[in-house]
Amino acid sequence: MNRRLRLIGIVVFALDAGVVGGGVTSSLADEAGIEARVGELRGAILSLFAPAGAVATETNSNYKGAATPAPAAPPSPAAADWPSYNKTLTSERFSDLSQINTKNVAKLKVLCTYDTGRLTSFETGPIMVEGALIGTTEFDIFSIDPSTCAENWRTHEEYPAYIIPTNRGAAYLDGRLFRGTQDGRVLAYDFKTGKRLWETTIADAKKGEVVPAAPIAWEGLVFIGNAGGDFKGAKGHMYALDAKTGKIVWQFFLVPKTEGDTVRGPEGTSPLDTSTWKNVPGAPITGGGTWTSTTLDPANGLLYVPVGNPAPDFDNSVRPGDNLFTGSVVVLDAKTGAYKKHFQLVPRDWHDWDVSNPPILINTRGGKRLMAVSPKDGHLYGFDLADNKLLYRTPVTRIENAEEPFAVDKDVHFCPGSTGGEEWNSPGYDPLTNHIFTGDVDWCTTVKLQTREEIAAAPLGEPWMGEKTFNPFNEFGKFSRADGFWAGWLYATDADTGMWKWRLKSNYPIYGAVTPTAGGLVFFGDVGGNFYAIDAATGQKLWGQKIGGAIAGGVITFTVNGTQKVAVATGYVSPAVPTEIRRARIAILGIEGETGSK
């Protein structure tokens, strides 16, 4: 392990050691304890100087669209739950609950919190099924009572800690729960007890391949892939597993298969070859990780897979060509893994602009069947699925200097940066307003390239960015403080035209989920720990409060005993993002005394 990677690892051990419920494998236990105390001091300093949350809304005077929203449909029986990562398999994130609405949201308050006891990169997208709320940390899966936040059960796993300790959530199907691990496995658990039922290896941790994504499940299958596309030699694959046994039903290579690659199950048919990868000698085809969840069209049995960056991330001269299927949404037959089509959004990527979240599949007010997706390049893309043509590409955060090539002899500044744009959470779609809501990060990066010799010297299985830095916190490029440092954007964009109606700027980036409801609200949070309820029609803030640590995971809403509640994952701590050091918690909010649908 090189010194830079070890430094990052020590910091992550520090973030995850010595707290209630902790349990990293701890050969560095003493060292980590020291670093943890330093981390707590860092958190206190950040808390002292962190500004209060603030938002400002701007209306587009050129917007032409529907003057009034469509009438709300009555809640369906399924509205009581949030059964999948993005609620529906098609990922719209819309809830038809309206008990909490524009008229009473001012009375919203935190009712209870569940403390995981961990300092971790808390990105879990909770699910709510059969009266229990399920969440994950890097090492744990837990079930809590959504009425009281009392723990039903918690199952802890032991394996070596990863550079950034992340897990994005679990899937549910027929009494079983499923999650990935940072040592390359998929695990299944009994929903009621948390007992482990099976495990299947789908990635090679020695190569840098990990499984942080939230799976989805449908018709006896569990769909999940591996991340690790920033590590030399690592490749992305997509899998379907048998939900009862864990057996691999099919495997699909998201970048070309070459000699020596591991085949773990039957392969889905693919047209992919090496023609779009003209790599220089000694540079292995690398990248294409699928590090976030996926989307499924159950009517047509199609799986939509977002695919990450090629590597080395910042030097595309090492790998001339479009580098398929990186920077794409790949559509597969969900039953067989056979290739159907793809949409490449970021060809020849040199900014680390992954397609970083599941696309949403919607029927617009104008009668279109649309795929909308918002990757890290800072745009919202809308594709008409009738002919697969691009309808619009709308900027939804600051875009600057996006075309300048990177160089060995100078710094190049660009926006959005490598952790900018829309990250691992999907947009949300509100059928009542016909708006797509995107939550984005406005944060720039400065890059200077390594020499070709330095890039070639990187060992297999080590980070392979191509960027010249000795700061472990800048592994994804040097983040800029010179231009206002950072912000967040929430855009409301017409699903038919791609024109934005209103946009809201937050003084903290928006990494967490965006959730619209039939109550006329949009819920979101920022990495300042501020949680907001926004009027979906106008963009005006109706309620806001700091509810804990940085918000970068799920925001879901559901009912318990006829009462609507909202659950938020708070306490995101990452060596790449300067947030307050607070333990990971689930906050459950509601309005006391409100019961029944309205």
What residues fall within each predicted segment?
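Aromatic (tryptophan-biased) beta-strands that constitute blades/sheets of beta-rich domains
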Residues: 37, 43-116, 150-159, 195-204, ...
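Blade-level signature of beta-propeller repeat domains, shared across WD40, Kelch, NHL, RCC1
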Residues: 556-598
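Bacterial N-terminal signal peptides
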Residues: 9-20
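Phosphate/diphosphate-binding loops
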Residues: 358-396, 402-404, 409-423, 536
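Repeat-blade elements of multi-bladed beta-propeller folds
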Residues: 82-86, 119-140, 162-186, 210-231, ...
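Structural motif
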Residues: 233-237, 326, 379-381, 446-451, ...
